Regions:
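Short, conserved catalytic/metal-binding micro-motifs enriched in Asp/Glu and His
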Residues: 154-166
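Catalytic center-proximal scaffold of phosphoryl-transfer enzymes
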Residues: 1-150, 163
Length: 166
C-alpha cells in the first residue's frame, strides 16, 4: 500500500512537471513534493513496531520543510497524506501486541487469536480481511508457536518459542 501511495504521488509530480515544461530542451525541475519526501523518508513510522520507535519531542530543523519538527510531526504528516495509514498502523499493532502478550501462553493465544480474526474480518480493508483468513487457516500452527521450550545455545539454557519450521 505504501509503495502504491508513493507511486501515485510521484506520478502526480511527473505530470505536474510535464505540464510546466513548455520547452523539452529546458525541462522545469520541481523540488520533491512534501508527500513524496514524507513517504520516502518517514514511512518507517508506519512500518516499524511502535514499541521500537523512539519518539523525540525535541524539535530539529527539517531541511525539506525548513521548520522545526519532531517525530510526532512526521507521523502527523503521514496521517494527513492518507488517513488510512493510521488505521493500517493500528490494525498491524494489534497483531504485534497479540504476539508479544502471548509468548509462553498458548491458551491465552487461542482465545485472543479468535478475537483478532473477528476484528480483522470486520475491517473495511481487504488486506486485513485476507490476513484474517490466513490467521484462521493457520491458527493451530500459530498457537503452537507460543509454546516455550528450553534450548541450549552458547553454553546457556534459555526459553524459546517452539518453531513450526524444519
Amino acid at each position: 500500500y505504501m509503495r502504491q501511495l508513493l507511486k501515485k504521488y510521484k506520478q502526480r509530480d511527473r505530470e505536474r512537471q510535464e505540464q510546466l515544461t513548455s520547452d523539452p530542451l529546458h525541462p522545469v525541475q520541481l523540488p520533491i513534493s512534501d508527500e513524496v519526501y514524507i513517504l520516502q523518508k518517514y514511512r518507517w513510522l508506519i512500518l516499524s513496531n511502535q514499541s521500537n520507535i523512539r519518539y523525540h519531542s525535541d524539535l530539529r530543523m527539517d531541511q525539506h520543510f525548513h521548520v522545526l519538527m519532531n517525530t510526532y510531526d512526521y507521523e502527523d504528516w503521514l496521517f494527513r497524506i492518507d488517513s488510512n495509514l493510521k488505521d493500517f498502523r493500528d490494525l498491524k499493532e494489534q497483531y504485534v501486541l497479540f504476539n508479544s502478550r502471548n509468548g509462553g501462553n498458548p491458551i491465552a493465544a487461542r482465545t485472543e487469536i479468535d478475537e483478532l480474526i473477528v476484528a480483522y474480518k470486520k475491517s473495511s480493508y481487504e488486506m486485513f480481511r485476507d490476513f484474517a483468513n490466513l490467521l484462521e487457516k493457520y491458527k493451530d500452527p500459530i498457537i503452537n508457536s507460543f509454546i516455550m521450550v528450553k534450548k541450549v545455545g552458547n553454553g546457556k539454557i534459555y526459553d524459546s518459542r517452539l518453531s513450526n519450521g524444519p
